[in-house]
C-alpha cells in the first residue's frame, strides 16, 4: 500500500523550487568583503604602540579610543582634543555612560607623567574602565 506522490512527474515536467545557490554565493562574497573592510574602519591616528605578549581581549561593538601621540597631542577617535575638552568630548561620545571602557593608546615614547595625568583625569571624571592598548608580539619561548 505504498503511495506515490509524484506519479505523473516525468523528465520534461517543470520544477517549481527556488534555486538559492546564487543567493548564497552573493551572501558569502558580501561576508568576505565586510570581514576585510571592518578592521580598516578603526582609528587612523598613527601611534607607535609598545609591544605586549598578553592574550588579546575581544573588542566591543563601538570602541572608544583615546590616543596620545609622541608630541603629547591627544585624540578621541580621529578628533583632536585638549586637556580641557577631553572629558566633554568623552561625555558626548559615550552619552554620559561612565561604565564605558576607554581604550587608551599611547605612543611608547610618551613619558609616564603624561600617561598618569590623562588616566587621573579620566578617573576623576568617573571613567574607571580603562583598557591599555599595545602591539601584539610573538610569545617568548
Swiss-Prot record:
Membrane topology: Single-pass type II membrane protein
Signal peptide: none
Keywords: Bacteriocin transport, Cell inner membrane, Cell membrane, Membrane, Protein transport, Signal-anchor, Transmembrane, Transmembrane helix, Transport
Protein's UniProt keywords contain Cell inner membrane: yes
Matches recorded under Pfam families: ExbD
Stimuli inducing this protein: Induced 2.1-fold by hydroxyurea.
GO molecular function, one term: protein homodimerization activity
InterPro entries, sorted: ExbD (IPR003400), TonB_ExbD_1 (IPR014170)
Location within or outside the cell: Cell inner membrane
Protein name: Biopolymer transport protein ExbD
Gene from which this protein is expressed: exbD
